[in-house]
Amino acid sequence: MALDPEQQQPISSVSREFGKSSGEISPEREPLIKENHVPENYSVVAAILPFLFPALGGLLYGYEIGATSCATISLQSPSLSGISWYNLSSVDVGLVTSGSLYGALFGSIVAFTIADVIGRRKELILAALLYLVGALVTALAPTYSVLIIGRVIYGVSVGLAMHAAPMYIAETAPSPIRGQLVSLKEFFIVLGMVGGYGIGSLTVNVHSGWRYMYATSVPLAVIMGIGMWWLPASPRWLLLRVIQGKGNVENQREAAIKSLCCLRGPAFVDSAAEQVNEILAELTFVGEDKEVTFGELFQGKCLKALIIGGGLVLFQQITGQPSVLYYAPSILQTAGFSAAGDATRVSILLGLLKLIMTGVAVVVIDRLGRRPLLLGGVGGMVVSLFLLGSYYLFFSASPVVAVVALLLYVGCYQLSFGPIGWLMISEIFPLKLRGRGLSLAVLVNFGANALVTFAFSPLKELLGAGILFCGFGVICVLSLVFIFFIVPETKGLTLEEIEAKCL
C-alpha cells in the first residue's frame, strides 16, 4: 500500500544521511561498509531456535528422500503393502519417487512470486502447513492417484522450505557464525536422510509400513509450524520494506529492533537500535531503496549474483551427485560388502558418512572460508570420479577401487558442494534480489537434479558407466575453474558487505 508524504519522509532522510539515491557510490561513504560496524553481541543459545525451526524444513526434505527409498519397496509387497494396487509398474514407482521433485519445481516458481511479499517467516509457516497436508494425504492415501497428489503437495513444501530457510537463517544469524548455521541446514538434510533410512528399515517389513514412514513427518511438520509462528520476522526483510516505502516506517523499524533483540538474546538489547540504523544505512548505501524489476535480475550485480549462485547449484547437481548415490548400492554389492537385500543398511552407512563429513564442514567453514573448502573438496571429487570411471573401464577385477572412489566422492562432496552451495546462495544475492534470486537458484537446483536423475540410465546404456563417470569428472574440472575465477570469499563479512565488496 502506498504511503502518504509524512510516512515516506523518513525514507528519504535515511537516503540523504547514509547513502546514495542515484546508484553512484561516493568515496566518503566507503568506511561505512568497511569498518564502522557495531560489534555483534549475541547469545549462542538465543541463536539456536532461529536456526532450528527453519532447519526442520531441511530435515523433512532429507527424511522424505530416505523414507521414499524404503517406501517403494513396501508399496510393492503383495503381503505387506496393505493395498490392492501394489502391482506398480516402473513408471508408477518412478512417479512415487519423483513426485516430490515435480512439486519442488513448482514450489520454487511459487516462491519467486510470493517471497518478498509475505516474507521468509510466513513462507516457512506455509511450507510447514503443506508438509503436514502432504504427509497426511500420502500416509492415508486410499488410491495410487491420491498418493501421487500427496507426494506433489509435499514437494511444493520442499521447494518453499529450501528457498526460505537459507534466507531466514542467513538474515537472522550473527555474521561470525552465519556460515556454520547455514551449513548446519545441510547437516539436517543429511540427518533427515539417515533418519528416513532408519525408520524405513524398521518398518519396511511391517504391514502397511509405507504409511508409517510417511506419517512420521506429521509431528515434525507441526513442530516446525509452531516454532516459525513463535519466531519473529527477518529484521532485514522488515528493513527492506522500510527503505522501499512499504508499510509504516516507524512500526517496521521498531519491529526490526524487537526482532533483533529476540534473535540475539539479552546481550544485544543495548545495541539493537544502533545495529538497525547501521543496516538501514548500508542497505541504502548499496542501492536497496529501489525495488528490482524482472529485467534488472539479469543486469549488473544482480546478474553477477545469479551467475555465482546459479552456477554453484548447477555444478552441484551436474557433477553427478544424484547418479553416484543412485549407483552406490550396486557398487558396494559388487565389492561384496552387502547382499542385495541389505540395500537399506548400505544407504544408512553412506548417510552416516555424509553426516560426519558435513559435520566437519560445519566446524571449519567459518575458520577456513568457503573457497578453500570448495576448491579442496571439488578437487577430491575430480580424483574420485576419474577413479570410479577407471574402475569400470580398466580395473573391474578390483572392486576396492570403486569403494574407495565412492567413499572419497561422498566425503568430498559433503565438504564442498553439499553445504557450501546452499550457504553461498543465501549470502550472495543482494537483499532486494534475495527472494527472487534464491528462488531461481532453487529452481536450477531441482531442475538440474531432475535432468541428471532422468538422463543417467539412458546415458549409462549409451556410453557405459566408465565413460559416463569420466564425463562427470570433466564437468567437475570445469566447476573447479568456475570456483577459482568466479566465486568470491565471503567469510566474516556481513550480508551488506558481501553486496558492496563482492558484486
UniProtKB/Swiss-Prot annotation:
Please indicate which superkingdom the organism of origin belongs to: Eukaryota
Question: In this chain, where does the modification N-acetylalanine occur?
Answer: A2
Which keywords does this chain's UniProt record carry?
A: Acetylation, Membrane, Phosphoprotein, Sugar transport, Transmembrane, Transmembrane helix, Transport
Where does the record place the region Disordered? Answer: 1-32
What parts of the sequence cross the membrane? 42-62, 99-119, 124-144, 146-166, 187-207, 213-233, 305-325, 346-366, 375-395, 400-420, 437-457, 467-487
Q: Does the keyword Cell inner membrane apply?
A: no
Where is it located? Membrane
Give the record's membrane topology. Answer: Multi-pass membrane protein
* Gene Ontology cellular component list: membrane; plant-type vacuole; plastid
Q: Which residues form a coiled coil?
A: none
Family membership noted in the UniProt record? Belongs to the major facilitator superfamily. Sugar transporter (TC 2.A.1.1) family.
Know the name of this protein?
D-xylose-proton symporter-like 2
Q: Which organism is it from?
A: Arabidopsis thaliana
